Amino acid sequence: MANITVFYNEDFQGKQVDLPPGNYTRAQLAALGIENNTISSVKVPPGVKAILYQNDGFAGDQIEVVANAEELGPLNNNVSSIRVISVPVQPRARFFYKEQFDGKEVDLPPGQYTQAELERYGIDNNTISSVKPQGLAVVLFKNDNFSGDTLPVNSDAPTLGAMNNNTSSIRIS
Protein backbone atom coordinates (compact mmCIF):
# COMPACT_ATOMS: atom_id res chain seq x y z
CA MET A 1 0.00 0.00 0.00
CA ALA A 2 1.44 3.38 -1.03
CA ASN A 3 1.73 6.37 1.30
CA ILE A 4 1.84 10.05 0.48
CA THR A 5 4.53 12.22 2.08
CA VAL A 6 3.69 15.75 3.21
CA PHE A 7 6.42 18.38 3.61
CA TYR A 8 6.53 21.63 5.59
CA ASN A 9 8.36 23.49 2.79
CA GLU A 10 7.98 23.76 -0.97
CA ASP A 11 10.07 21.53 -3.25
CA PHE A 12 9.86 18.58 -0.81
CA GLN A 13 11.98 20.27 1.85
CA GLY A 14 11.69 20.55 5.62
CA LYS A 15 9.90 18.28 8.06
CA GLN A 16 8.15 15.36 6.39
CA VAL A 17 5.52 12.84 7.47
CA ASP A 18 4.20 9.77 5.62
CA LEU A 19 0.43 9.22 5.55
CA PRO A 20 -1.13 5.90 4.46
CA PRO A 21 -4.61 5.85 2.92
CA GLY A 22 -7.19 7.22 5.33
CA ASN A 23 -8.98 10.36 6.47
CA TYR A 24 -7.07 12.85 8.62
CA THR A 25 -8.77 15.63 10.55
CA ARG A 26 -6.81 18.49 12.11
CA ALA A 27 -6.64 16.59 15.43
CA GLN A 28 -5.44 13.39 13.73
CA LEU A 29 -2.76 15.31 11.82
CA ALA A 30 -1.65 16.98 15.07
CA ALA A 31 -1.40 13.55 16.74
CA LEU A 32 1.02 12.57 13.95
CA GLY A 33 3.13 15.67 14.59
CA ILE A 34 1.78 17.78 11.73
CA GLU A 35 0.97 21.30 12.90
CA ASN A 36 -2.03 23.10 11.39
CA ASN A 37 -1.42 25.09 8.20
CA THR A 38 2.18 23.94 7.69
CA ILE A 39 2.06 21.71 4.58
CA SER A 40 3.68 23.20 1.46
CA SER A 41 4.41 20.23 -0.83
CA VAL A 42 3.32 16.60 -1.22
CA LYS A 43 4.79 13.49 -2.84
CA VAL A 44 2.07 11.25 -4.25
CA PRO A 45 3.24 7.92 -5.75
CA PRO A 46 1.21 5.78 -8.16
CA GLY A 47 -1.66 3.97 -6.43
CA VAL A 48 -2.88 6.86 -4.26
CA LYS A 49 -4.24 10.38 -4.54
CA ALA A 50 -4.63 13.06 -1.90
CA ILE A 51 -7.40 15.58 -1.38
CA LEU A 52 -6.19 18.52 0.69
CA TYR A 53 -8.77 20.69 2.47
CA GLN A 54 -8.42 24.23 3.76
CA ASN A 55 -10.61 23.60 6.82
CA ASP A 56 -10.92 20.88 9.41
CA GLY A 57 -13.52 18.20 8.76
CA PHE A 58 -12.85 18.03 5.00
CA ALA A 59 -14.42 21.42 4.30
CA GLY A 60 -13.51 24.63 2.52
CA ASP A 61 -11.35 25.02 -0.55
CA GLN A 62 -9.72 21.81 -1.72
CA ILE A 63 -7.25 20.50 -4.27
CA GLU A 64 -6.82 16.98 -5.55
CA VAL A 65 -3.19 15.93 -5.88
CA VAL A 66 -2.47 12.97 -8.18
CA ALA A 67 1.33 13.30 -8.60
CA ASN A 68 4.22 14.95 -6.78
CA ALA A 69 3.27 18.58 -6.07
CA GLU A 70 6.23 20.91 -5.46
CA GLU A 71 3.91 23.67 -4.25
CA LEU A 72 0.24 23.91 -3.32
CA GLY A 73 -0.77 27.32 -4.67
CA PRO A 74 -3.57 28.88 -2.61
CA LEU A 75 -3.47 26.00 -0.10
CA ASN A 76 0.24 26.48 0.62
CA ASN A 77 0.52 26.48 4.44
CA ASN A 78 -3.28 26.41 4.52
CA VAL A 79 -4.23 22.71 4.88
CA SER A 80 -6.24 21.51 7.90
CA SER A 81 -7.51 18.08 6.81
CA ILE A 82 -6.51 15.44 4.25
CA ARG A 83 -8.01 12.39 2.58
CA VAL A 84 -5.55 9.83 1.16
CA ILE A 85 -7.34 7.48 -1.22
CA SER A 86 -6.10 4.28 -2.87
CA VAL A 87 -6.62 4.32 -6.64
CA PRO A 88 -5.69 1.88 -9.41
CA VAL A 89 -2.11 2.27 -10.54
CA GLN A 90 -2.08 3.96 -13.95
CA PRO A 91 0.75 4.55 -16.38
CA ARG A 92 2.17 8.06 -16.27
CA ALA A 93 3.48 10.17 -19.11
CA ARG A 94 6.96 11.58 -18.51
CA PHE A 95 7.89 15.16 -19.40
CA PHE A 96 11.45 16.50 -19.64
CA TYR A 97 12.86 20.03 -19.46
CA LYS A 98 15.51 19.26 -22.11
CA GLU A 99 15.53 17.56 -25.48
CA GLN A 100 16.58 13.91 -25.77
CA PHE A 101 14.83 13.01 -22.48
CA ASP A 102 17.29 14.95 -20.37
CA GLY A 103 17.05 17.43 -17.52
CA LYS A 104 14.34 17.68 -14.91
CA GLU A 105 11.55 15.12 -15.40
CA VAL A 106 7.98 15.00 -14.13
CA ASP A 107 5.51 12.08 -14.37
CA LEU A 108 1.76 12.76 -14.70
CA PRO A 109 -1.17 10.32 -14.82
CA PRO A 110 -4.08 10.70 -17.26
CA GLY A 111 -5.93 13.97 -16.80
CA GLN A 112 -6.19 17.57 -17.94
CA TYR A 113 -3.60 20.04 -16.70
CA THR A 114 -3.87 23.82 -17.00
CA GLN A 115 -0.81 26.03 -16.59
CA ALA A 116 -1.52 26.46 -12.86
CA GLU A 117 -1.85 22.70 -12.38
CA LEU A 118 1.34 22.02 -14.32
CA GLU A 119 3.17 24.49 -12.10
CA ARG A 120 1.80 22.71 -9.00
CA TYR A 121 3.40 19.51 -10.27
CA GLY A 122 6.72 21.20 -11.01
CA ILE A 123 6.39 22.00 -14.72
CA ASP A 124 6.99 25.70 -15.25
CA ASN A 125 5.31 27.43 -18.18
CA ASN A 126 6.99 26.85 -21.56
CA THR A 127 9.67 24.44 -20.29
CA ILE A 128 8.83 21.04 -21.83
CA SER A 129 11.33 19.88 -24.47
CA SER A 130 10.74 16.11 -24.79
CA VAL A 131 8.03 13.60 -23.84
CA LYS A 132 7.69 9.85 -23.21
CA PRO A 133 3.93 9.07 -23.28
CA GLN A 134 4.54 5.51 -21.97
CA GLY A 135 1.48 4.08 -23.72
CA LEU A 136 -0.74 7.12 -23.15
CA ALA A 137 -2.02 9.71 -25.63
CA VAL A 138 -0.62 13.17 -24.86
CA VAL A 139 -1.74 16.45 -26.43
CA LEU A 140 0.37 19.54 -25.80
CA PHE A 141 -1.33 22.94 -26.09
CA LYS A 142 0.52 26.18 -26.76
CA ASN A 143 -1.83 28.24 -24.59
CA ASP A 144 -3.37 27.79 -21.17
CA ASN A 145 -6.82 26.19 -20.89
CA PHE A 146 -6.31 23.85 -23.85
CA SER A 147 -6.21 26.42 -26.64
CA GLY A 148 -3.85 27.47 -29.40
CA ASP A 149 -1.60 25.24 -31.47
CA THR A 150 -1.50 21.57 -30.49
CA LEU A 151 0.92 18.70 -30.79
CA PRO A 152 -0.36 15.14 -30.30
CA VAL A 153 2.34 12.84 -28.89
CA ASN A 154 1.68 9.09 -29.06
CA SER A 155 5.26 7.81 -29.04
CA ASP A 156 8.55 8.93 -27.54
CA ALA A 157 9.34 12.46 -28.75
CA PRO A 158 12.99 13.41 -28.11
CA THR A 159 12.28 16.86 -29.57
CA LEU A 160 9.05 18.85 -29.94
CA GLY A 161 9.78 21.12 -32.91
CA ALA A 162 7.74 24.33 -32.74
CA MET A 163 6.27 23.24 -29.39
CA ASN A 164 9.71 23.01 -27.75
CA ASN A 165 9.54 25.18 -24.61
CA ASN A 166 6.14 26.35 -25.84
CA THR A 167 3.53 24.35 -23.87
CA SER A 168 1.07 25.86 -21.37
CA SER A 169 -1.51 23.07 -20.92
CA ILE A 170 -1.70 19.30 -21.46
CA ARG A 171 -4.28 16.54 -21.90
CA ILE A 172 -3.28 12.95 -21.16
CA SER A 173 -5.55 9.97 -21.90
Swiss-Prot record:
Q: Where is the signal peptide?
A: none
Identify the residues that bind Ca(2+) 1: 8, 38, 40, 77
Q: Which UniProt keywords apply?
A: Calcium, Metal-binding, Repeat, Sporulation
Q: Which Pfam families match?
A: Crystall
Q: What is the effect of changing residue 40 to R?
A: Suppresses completely calcium-binding
The consequence of residue 129 to R is: Lower calcium affinity
Q: Where is the Beta/gamma crystallin 'Greek key' domain?
A: 2-46, 48-86, 91-135, 136-173
Q: GO MF terms on file?
A: metal ion binding
- Coiled-coil residues: none
The regions listed as transmembrane in this protein's record are none
User: So what does this one do?
Assistant: Protein S, induced in large amounts during fruiting body formation, assembles on the surface of myxospores in the presence of calcium ions.
Q: Fill in the domain comment.
A: Has a two-domain beta-structure, folded into four very similar Greek key motifs. The N-terminal domain (NPS) binds 2 calcium ions.
Task: Please give the name of this protein.
Answer: Development-specific protein S
Species assigned in the record? Myxococcus xanthus
